[in-house]
């Protein structure tokens, strides 16, 4: 994976970094000002994760507000650095949080000694749990995938990103591109916060040569905004008429727009409290409310958000991500199958029926690529859970996306379900057969009746999987998988219905994750794991395993 900024060796970084020797002007117990000359490209801010956020107002030479950000500035220890781009001299107006901020203490904070000027920012990986073939941010926090589209042979992935730390904050649209859905190249920030608020989740469509982004502006109220790109999605200009949609509904967010070829109209679906609202437009600017869906349908154990609406074969599918309320606690993706006429979605199932797209603990914010080739419906998910996403044992970065998945339709007992299979691109990185599991591999298991699979290492850490042919269930037990200490919600057993018999399982292992699929796409389960050593032992009862390298 290429780096977000200039990639260099640590030794070079030392040679090109200059200690800023910042002298804070302490104005009170929690307040300081720092003037920073330009000199270098970046100001590297030292972060200490256990500290509370410092609120930083960035002003230019005319004392005009440039941006606001929250950074956990280091008090007595530096965990890592984050870059603040210096395109001019700046004044940082910093307000610390907490009750131990005496004037004397603020002057002695280690951040003033450790702040650096630099023309480069080192993104060399220092994390043993960084996945090898899953998309991750090169540094910082990531959650929901946003604005995904395909154009001119390139897959575009935007995502909820914190450029100033590895916990949720400062929501911005990060951006990565790929030609094969596996190898991703990080791009500059796509959309940053403004007077309307930080940038929450949304979508992109292509309209002629333009790429049009729709997103939630998260300020005092959540409103919907748009921006247009004239260069294929690399840079965006915000619409002067923002916001384009407002409401007094709680949790009014995450617009997903698409062209409805059957109705010959643009549609947009977004979350509004415990329902999804559907709009139509002829010009992408003026939107007409058409209908709502969901008050009596599905699971309402948490906030509804991150919707999607699309057609597969002759069925329309509405995705609804919910947090909390998942089948094993925390966040998960439910879906509804039915019909849509451009104005109203009609679910074909009974109101109390709940269908889950993935029965693991770590699969959320699932959305699809707009304009995928060959009528494919390709999705990515955020591979984590809001119960512990901020606590997982990484620091340089947090969170990854799932492998790409193709959706289909199948019937079982007169109900219609969505099938989920690894995208065909995963076969292109399948390497030679090997004898033992490694930290990055694919395991194909041919099953005859019920089966058990045990993955383990020399430390006794293990993941147990069980397929019960009679009960038609598949389960995964990660209670002894490695480091489970960071959250009481992490050690668990997840269980999925298989909707018939399983003939073959495909397991994708990538350092901190296991994704399990049955070959027909009727069962999928995604779980994080944090073993202290890679699982290099496999025991299978009731089947035969073939192990493949993953060519990274």
Model regions: which residues?
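Bacterial Sec-dependent N-terminal signal peptides
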Residues: 1-22
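Beta-rich accessory regions
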Residues: 22-64, 84-86, 90-101, 121, ...
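Surface loop/turn signatures of beta-propeller and other carbohydrate-active proteins
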Residues: 22-33, 64-84, 107-146, 165-168, ...
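Hydrophobic core segments of beta-strands in well-ordered, beta-rich domains
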Residues: 45, 94-95, 144-164, 187-189, ...
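Non-cytosolic beta-sandwich-type ligand-binding/adhesion modules
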Residues: 48-100, 172-179, 228-230, 281, ...
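Repetitive beta-architecture junctions, highlighting loop-to-beta-strand starts
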Residues: 54, 171-173, 222-224, 274-276, ...
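Flexible loop/turn segments at secondary-structure boundaries
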Residues: 164-166, 197-198, 220-222, 275-277, ...
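Beta-propeller blade signature
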Residues: 174-178, 225-232, 279-283, 331-342, ...
């Amino acid at each position: 994976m290429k780096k977000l900024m200039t990639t260099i060796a640590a030794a070079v970084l030392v040679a090109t970094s200059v200690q800023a020797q910042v002298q804070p002007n302490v104005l009170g117990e929690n307040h300081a000002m720092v003037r920073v000359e330009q000199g270098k490209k970046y100001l590297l801010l030292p972060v200490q994760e256990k500290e509370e956020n410092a609120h930083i107002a960035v002003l230019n030479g005319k004392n005009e507000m440039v941006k606001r950000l929250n950074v956990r500035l280091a008090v007595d220890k530096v965990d890592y650095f984050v870059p603040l781009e210096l395109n001019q001299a700046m004044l940082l107006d910093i307000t610390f949080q907490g009750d131990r901020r005496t004037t004397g203490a603020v002057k002695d904070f280690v951040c003033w000694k450790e702040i650096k000027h630099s023309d480069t920012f080192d993104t060399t990986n220092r994390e043993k749990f960084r996945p090898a073939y899953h998309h991750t941010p090169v540094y910082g926090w990531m959650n929901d995938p946003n604005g995904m589209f395909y154009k001119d042979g390139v897959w575009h992935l935007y995502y909820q990103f914190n450029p100033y730390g590895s916990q949720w904050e400062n929501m911005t649209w990060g951006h990565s591109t790929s030609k094969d859905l596996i190898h991703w190249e990080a791009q500059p920030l796509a959309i940053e916060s403004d007077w309307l608020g930080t940038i929450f989740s949304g979508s992109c469509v292509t309209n002629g040569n333009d790429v049009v982004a729709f997103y939630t502006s998260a300020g005092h109220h959540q409103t919907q905004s748009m921006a247009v790109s004239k260069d294929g999605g690399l840079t965006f200009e915000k619409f002067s008429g923002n916001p384009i949609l407002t409401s007094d509904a709680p949790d009014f967010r995450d617009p997903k727009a698409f062209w409805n070829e059957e109705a010959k109209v643009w549609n947009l679906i977004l979350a509004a409290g415990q329902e999804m609202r559907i709009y139509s437009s002829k010009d992408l600017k003026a939107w007409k409310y058409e209908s709502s869906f969901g008050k009596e349908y599905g699971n309402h154990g948490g906030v509804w958000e991150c919707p999607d609406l699309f057609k597969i074969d002759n069925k329309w599918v509405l995705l609804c991500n919910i947090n909390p309320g998942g089948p094993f606690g925390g966040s998960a993706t439910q879906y509804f199958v039915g019909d849509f006429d451009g104005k109203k979605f009609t679910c074909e199932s009974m109101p109390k029926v709940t269908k889950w797209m993935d029965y693991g603990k770590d699969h959320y914010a699932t959305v699809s690529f707009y304009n995928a080739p060959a009528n494919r419906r390709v999705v990515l998910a955020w591979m984590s859970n809001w119960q512990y996403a901020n606590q997982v044992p990484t620091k340089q970065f947090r969170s990854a996306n799932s492998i790409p998945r193709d959706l289909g339709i199948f019937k079982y007992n007169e109900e219609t379900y969505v099938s989920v299979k690894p995208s065909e691109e995963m076969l292109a990185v399948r390497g030679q057969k090997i004898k033992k599991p490694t930290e990055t591999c694919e395991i194909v298991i041919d099953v005859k009746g019920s089966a058990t699979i045990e993955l383990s290492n020399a430390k006794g850490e293990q993941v147990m999987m069980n397929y019960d042919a009679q009960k038609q269930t598949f389960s995964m037990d990660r209670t002894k998988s490695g480091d489970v200490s960071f959250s009481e919600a992490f050690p668990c057993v997840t269980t999925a219905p298989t909707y018939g018999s399983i003939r073959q399982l495909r397991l994708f292992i990538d350092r901190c994750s296991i994704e399990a699929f049955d070959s027909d796409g009727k069962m999928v389960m995604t779980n994080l794991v944090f073993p202290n050593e890679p699982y290099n032992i496999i025991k299978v009862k009731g089947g035969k395993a073939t192990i493949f390298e993953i060519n990274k």
